Design a protein with these regions (language model features):
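Short Gly/Ser/Thr- and charged-rich N-terminal loops/segments
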Residues: 25-28
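Short hydrophobic alpha-helical segments enriched in small aliphatic residues
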Residues: 8, 13-15
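Metal-dependent C-N hydrolase catalytic cores
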Residues: 85-156, 331-340, 350
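Conformational coupling and interaction surfaces
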Residues: 41, 60-61, 68-69, 211, ...
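Intrinsic, low-complexity polybasic segments
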Residues: 5, 18-22
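A residue-level signal for conserved active-site and pocket-lining positions in enzyme catalytic cores
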Residues: 101, 220, 286
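Active-site histidine-anchored catalytic micro-motif
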Residues: 40-90, 130-236, 242
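Polybasic, lysine-rich low-complexity intrinsically disordered segments
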Residues: 35-38
């Protein structure tokens, strides 16, 4: 919860709570840090719902030498879109990335859908693990809605932009509905979502990002553009414990220290759930872009169940497997991750965040 008038929380002059760690109090005015660009860099729009693991993924993209982060778009999911947008702007101010931040969808494509409860037991009441976030920031969101920013940037850089989507797929679906031509203009889509040969994490059938807007996810999977899906089949194998977070903070300075600080309750949740540390869901999707050799993939057409008890279930039809006529027929084959070198993924995060 942010400090401010009426909520009984005392603040420093910069708007942060008393007792906030130095990594927060030192944010101050927005920084701007720029990487030296080259022609081999991958242009990325990061569609996100920050979100604790989203923060780590965003820092990874910001720090990676071969990533040109050209846009950040927000959506509902780990918290309301108001909170996730504020969180993305806070991280922009703290870390100094230049990419515009655009506010996106507040709910799923289907307006009659039952509003979902935010996962406060995982990501805290503010989406960033209850880590104190200033109520007032010195950076502002782009005037365009997220789907329009996606359309504009993809059209401005045909064949060059990869969409890395780690929340509900609503912004991507809205962009496709408004501008179907972008499907032929993107370099690719990498998403964190789905449970293809394992159980889900919000229901036995469904992973949360897909369940939260199943119609949007089905559109994303069945559109004729290249999708790489990084689901629970692999992300749940990549766990970072407190020692790993401490190492990141030691290697990565103040930027990584902020990730360490806001991840503490998130680690607790996963330890209580039987894991060895926090599951690094979203950063896996980023690393599938920069280091695809660390993953094993199958090719499959994918459909998403959009109603009933299995709503949000991602159902692959593997390449070459024969069935009778079905709703999978005629749809493009996508890449679905089924294996991962977890140790190498964690090592790559450390190497990328190292100052």
């Amino acid at each position: 919860m942010a400090c401010g008038p009426g909520n009984g929380r005392a603040c420093h002059e910069d708007g942060t709570m008393w007792g906030a760690p130095a990594c927060l109090r030192a944010v101050g005015a927005p920084r701007t840090t720029r990487k030296k660009k080259n022609n081999n860099m991958l242009k990325v729009i990061f569609d996100t719902d920050p979100g604790v693991d989203d923060a780590l993924a965003l820092l990874y993209l910001h720090k990676h030498a071969q990533i040109d982060l050209i846009g950040v778009t927000t959506t509902f999911g780990n918290a309301s879109v108001e909170s996730t947008t504020h969180n993305a702007l806070y991280l922009k101010q703290a870390w100094g990335f230049a990419a515009p931040v655009a506010r996106g969808a507040a709910g799923p494509l289907q307006p009659e859908a039952t509003p979902e409860a935010w996962p406060v037991h995982i990501h805290g009441h503010n989406g960033l693990g209850n880590h104190p976030v200033p109520a007032q920031l010195d950076v502002a969101a782009d005037a365009r809605p997220a789907h329009q920013l996606i359309i504009d940037l993809v059209r401005a850089h045909p064949g060059e932009v990869t969409l890395v989507a780690v929340g509900r797929m609503t912004n991507l679906a809205l962009a496709l509905q408004q501008a179907p031509d972008i499907a032929g203009l993107v370099r690719g889509v990498v998403l964190m979502g789905g449970a293809f040969h394992v159980n889900g994490n919000i229901t036995p059938a469904a992973e949360a990002n897909i369940w939260g807007d199943a119609e949007a996810a089905d559109l994303v999977f069945t559109t004729d553009w290249p999708v790489t899906a990084i689901g629970l089949d692999v992300t749940t194998r990549v766990e970072m414990n407190r020692d790993g977070l401490d190492t990141l903070a030691a290697l990565g300075g103040a930027d990584a220290e902020l990730v360490r600080a806001l991840s503490q309750d998130y680690v607790d949740f996963y330890l209580q759930a039987g894991h060895k540390g926090m599951v690094v869901h979203d950063c896996c999707a980023c690393i599938a872009l920069t280091r695809p050799e660390l993953f094993q993939f199958e090719r499959a057409s994918v459909r998403v169940a959009t109603d009933g008890v299995a709503r949000g279930m991602t159902i692959p039809k593997p390449e070459g497997m024969g069935f009778g006529p079905s709703v999978w027929d005629g749809h493009v084959l996508q890449s679905v991750a089924i294996g991962v070198d977890a140790a190498a993924v964690l090592a790559d995060i450390e190497q990328t965040l190292k100052v």
